[in-house]
A protein has these predicted regions:
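Bacterial N-terminal signal peptides that target proteins for export
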Residues: 1-9
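Bacterial N-terminal signal peptides
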Residues: 8-18
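C-terminal/domain-edge helix-coil "capping" segments
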Residues: 20-36, 57, 101-105, 124-127, ...
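N-terminal segment of the mature soluble domain
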Residues: 34-37, 47-107, 112-114, 147, ...
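Second-shell loop/turn segments in exported
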Residues: 43-50, 85-89, 122, 156-161
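Solvent-exposed coil/turn segments that connect beta secondary-structure elements
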Residues: 43-46, 70, 75-78, 115-118, ...
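Short, surface-exposed coil-to-beta transition loops
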Residues: 128-132
Length: 188
């Protein structure tokens, strides 16, 4: 009896540990200056899920604003200014360089990226999986000063994670790292 209880407890522990897996890689350019004002472009959608790129960009804007450490340009203003220049904000792959877009928008930095995975993985229980990459470009120099690549699998066990929750947590983690590294320290 004790043996079967220990086996059951061990199985629950293993499922809990492996129920939510993530991989994160982040980098900050040494000596990079503080972000004064950032424009977040719609993220490129490399998935089959409609609007995954737009959702990722919106989540990052919300999370950056929530920190209070970085001034974020209103996404509707970004879209309007791009349209006035005959650029389609809904097609991030065809936009000019981030430096050129940043000069047009009069911001210090431009944040852009891609959603590489946004789906439920089939199996015994469908598991949400989200992958995103992001880059922050200093408009003055044209250099990438921050990058992040996150992949996360939610838990189908005990705590039912959905795609939106996994993506929101990922955006929160990216925004926290970015604001810690390059945001206004007085706002933290």
């Amino acid at each position: 009896m004790w043996r079967s209880a220990r086996v059951a407890l061990l199985a629950i522990g293993v499922l809990t540990l492996f129920g939510c897996a993530s991989a994160e890689q982040e980098w900050v350019r040494p000596g990079a200056g503080r972000v004064v004002r950032v424009a977040v472009l719609p993220f490129e959608n490399q998935t089959t899920s409609l609007r995954a790129g737009q959702a990722a960009g919106d989540l990052l804007v919300s999370q950056l604003l929530a920190t209070g450490a970085i001034s974020v340009m209103d996404p509707s203003e970004v879209a309007d200014l791009l349209r006035r220049e005959n650029l389609d904000p809904a097609d991030p792959g065809r936009l000019p360089s981030a430096q050129r877009v940043g000069r047009l928008l009069q911001v210090s930095h431009v944040l852009y990226g891609a959603v590489t995975e946004y789906r439920y993985k089939p199996g015994f229980s469908e598991t949400p999986a989200v992958g995103m990459t992001a880059r922050l470009v200093d408009v003055a120099s044209g250099e990438v000063v921050w990058t992040a690549s996150h992949a996360r699998i939610g838990s189908p066990w005990f705590r039912e994670d959905g795609l939106a929750r996994v993506a929101q947590q990922m955006a929160h983690d990216m925004a926290a790292h970015l604001t810690f590294a390059l945001g206004d320290a007085r706002a933290r």
